[in-house]
Amino acid sequence: MAVYAVTGGAGFLGRYIVKLLISADDVQEIRVIDIVEDPQPITSKVKVINYIQCDINDFDKVREALDGVNLIIHTAALVDVFGKYTDNEIMKVNYYGTQTILAACVDLGIKYLIYTSSMEAIGPNKHGDPFIGHEHTLYDISPGHVYAKSKRMAEQLVMKANNSVIMNGAKLYTCCLRPTGIYGEGDKLTKVFYEQCKQHGNIMYRTVDDNAVHSRVYVGNAAWMHVLAAKYIQYPGSKIKGNAYFCYDYSPSCSYDMFNLLLMKPLGIEQGSRIPRWMLKMYACKNDMKRILFRKPSLLNNYTLKISNTTFEVRTNNAELDFNYSPIFDVDVAFKRTRKWLEESE
């Protein structure tokens, strides 16, 4: 029976991973490691779940928290393209924090690491080039924001660490998973968009080109892919060692506006008029200045305007081929759960 650690386990994705691990037969203990205290800690009658408050940049505390762990699912990150955090803060957590986790793996002899990367480790790039493809599709990877850069650098770090020698001459095996835009109950961004629509009289004003298609994935399916990868990476001859995979399911691929409308229309949200691009650009520039001068974050800035209007569509089944992944939640269930959460959070 194994001991698993989930860094960022109090977060949106991390919490769902912890929930699914409760049903994993080979897991005896789950250590939930996060810098914040979970206001609603998950409990279980069949698994030992220990919550440990810890900064992943503090090596000594990380080492103490991970002592005795067999496998790490490393989800901890600052996910920010809105200007809430400084570039240094984002890089410190996402890149240097991952360095700390890898150093602990080497020092403690932890043999398996599943890393939550991001689609932004690949794109959309700073040129606004569309991406339609899979894990092996050629694409100009040129991050346009420090968040994307930090996830790219951390992914490369984790991939390079695969098959490296750790304590007692054992080997470390790693795998990276790249969620596309995650949605579901607990998604703060979806909640913000819903609240904005309510404030505008149940109208969703359109800000995104209808042709800018984006792949999405339900949080429960992204979490399941992590749990499944954690199982398969321990098999001798496993194909996933040293590889990266996009997280996907059968959620609609469409523009952000159209996706939100599909999700929220049963809640009474109606499609509104399109805001002119010149006006969006003007507000984006204004918000960028506020961020620079006053550190005021904003959903609309030049970076978010560009990436939301740039196609990033994943077409792959590599996770199915290499570790037998298939979604465990269909789209109807995912949408119903998300809608229920939105209604209850009003």
From Swiss-Prot:
GO terms for molecular function: 3-beta-hydroxy-Delta5-steroid dehydrogenase (NAD+) activity; steroid Delta-isomerase activity. InterPro entries: 3Beta_OHSteriod_DH/Estase, Lipid_A_modif_metabolic_enz, NAD(P)-bd_dom_sf. The keyword Isomerase applies. The active site is at residue 147. Signal peptide: none annotated. The keyword Isomerase applies. SUPFAM superfamilies: NAD(P)-binding Rossmann-fold domains. Induction: Expressed in the early phase of the viral replicative cycle. One of its GO terms (biological process) is steroid biosynthetic process. NAD(+) binds at residue 151. It comes from the Viruses. Transmembrane segments: none annotated. Keywords: Early protein, Host-virus interaction, Isomerase, Multifunctional enzyme, NAD, Oxidoreductase, Steroidogenesis, Viral immunoevasion. PANTHER family: BIFUNCTIONAL POLYMYXIN RESISTANCE PROTEIN ARNA, SHORT CHAIN DEHYDROGENASE_REDUCTASE FAMILY 42E, MEMBER 2. Belongs to the 3-beta-HSD family. This is 3 beta-hydroxysteroid dehydrogenase/Delta 5-->4-isomerase.
